Amino acid sequence: MPHARTETSVGTYESHSTSELEDLTEPEQRELKTKLTKLEAEIVTLRHVLAAKERRCGELKRKLGLTALVGLRQNLSKSWLDVQVSNTYVKQKTSAALSTMGTLICRKLGGVKKSATFRSFEGLMGTIKSKVSGGKRAWP
């Protein structure tokens, strides 16, 4: 059975058998074409109305200071805040802070060990130990 394809106004194709088209009388075909034309005209009108309403919406947003960049900035700010309060981010920041603190403590202790005061204290402790242990030094 042969098929005919017709394109509708929205760009989709519908398949009709040729016998189905032949079953329609000439007045029925004219009536359907008229309805189709009216429907397509309504669709065009609705598109124009929608475009006008979108323009008006944009104007109102601009007057209120709600531009696309403001909305984007607000979305990014909210997303960043959500990330900052997330458990993973907090744990990562805590871990990084503890690691940094540990590094600083090690550096400070290294600096203290090299200081003259610590060297003097170390020497004093060595002397006391040698006196207590009977003059034997455990290290050179």
UniProtKB/Swiss-Prot annotation:
Residues 28-57 form a coiled coil. The keyword Coiled coil applies. Residues 1-28 are annotated as: Disordered. Interacts with TPD52L2. This is Tumor protein D55. It comes from Homo sapiens (Human). Belongs to the TPD52 family. InterPro entries: TPD52. The keyword Coiled coil applies. Specifically expressed in testis. Expressed at 5.6-fold higher levels in adult testis than in fetal testis.
